């Protein structure tokens, strides 16, 4: 049986698929869709199911959604997700057998602890029901019938798995961007966080059936096997730069997207925890002693002791930390006491400073191939040591100027990617939240707005009232103000929705509170080595208003804990200008040289990107001249 149409998950793009044909000679039909949308006419390539080394399978596992201007082959190799299809088939048969056993011995609706299986996978028995898993004829084996790669994300790849159970599954395979210990830790916490959100917070999430934390399981990759949700991504309804309606109101679809995500946010922060860190199943955090219960007053006996507070898996604390031994790294990851909310800031600064020192030592010993200047690493050390100095004084826990300050400092669950891309809506209008990777428990006052609405640029609330002679401006100038207005509008709509669901916490969006946490936010949202400059900028800006904050009781101590010389401030100004010029003059600097594949191919075909002697790509001299002219023009206009 051949597949005539590519499978889909909402509007996730389907790149290629495998069709498995049952019979005496099992073989796969690999289908490659070489366009960036769902095609009805995929190409077909056959391979034997039992031949794991068939080269015709390789494209199914290779990364294909983008290219890098530098080290493209190396970056793509890190994102190859080759796994054992036969092993996946074995895992599916194993959870099916568990489902049959659970149906016989377990009361319907019972919640049993996770099952740590002999094949080095972990299954969640309460999700292994006939309704969820499906059925086959007696003596028949579970058989994968087709597979499709439906999403290649930043951190993992998603496959849709069809079977003879009459059910589809989702297989999530993380990229090997970090070491094995890091991936295992994050994966354990991700599954436990989703389990907690489902059973304790009442958030709809795809049910997890089974997971493995390393390559020793039958699939030979770390993985999560989940429920397949047939729906559309909420991102389809998100048009952030859409115009207001004719009567001056925001678009209905825009407001609806924000409302749905705000409802998730309200549930996530509804529970108070007993410490800061991340959520794990109890057995996965056994090494930690003297850790308080995750939360108090559990009345359901089946949930008592199910989860435990453990090391934080917030992305910034693990990203690019492979130079540090795991045991050393864990000393910076908590969990932290409920009575010391700013210890998270201090630990972040200590970790980043230590990581920069180790990298610098390797660089100076010619033992590192990293493309980073020693001067940048030295500056990082100074920056993050300053953040350590600032942390204890940053927030006055007894201030009267911030309403409900004690509640804002309590531990609350943070989903790191609260975004329309991570929400699925079914035909029945059921709304599911996806991708809990990197979830952590931290003070609400240190949680920034989600990235899809976050905006730190100039605020414009009403163009006609706030922009003099707007109608006389050029089209390009009008477009700039329109952009500012719409970004301001979107953030304001989010804050209004937040106030509607959680009015007692609205102080976290107040401008002074945003300024207080800005150095920490700049540190945890840092994407490149050079962005330490943004942490410096936030600390320097805070210094300018520190005395005012002290008089109003917002902060603990005066004078400001960090001293800057005139020379340091002047150098910072030069470095900041240079940093912004680089972002403008070097296309894709903000994405570390990554370019969506369609755009990459078009730029190469158009001669904008050319390959140099080292095999990397760079902007052609003609295109670079145009960019530099634009940068010079914009700088002159600014002056």
From Swiss-Prot:
The keyword Transit peptide appears for this protein: yes
Protein name: Altered inheritance of mitochondria protein 9, mitochondrial
Span of chain positions assigned to the transit peptide in the UniProt entry: 1-45
Sorted UniProt keywords: Mitochondrion, Transit peptide
Subcellular location per the Swiss-Prot or TrEMBL entry: Mitochondrion
Name of the coding gene: AIM9
Region annotation (Disordered) ranges: 619-639
GO cellular component, one term: mitochondrion
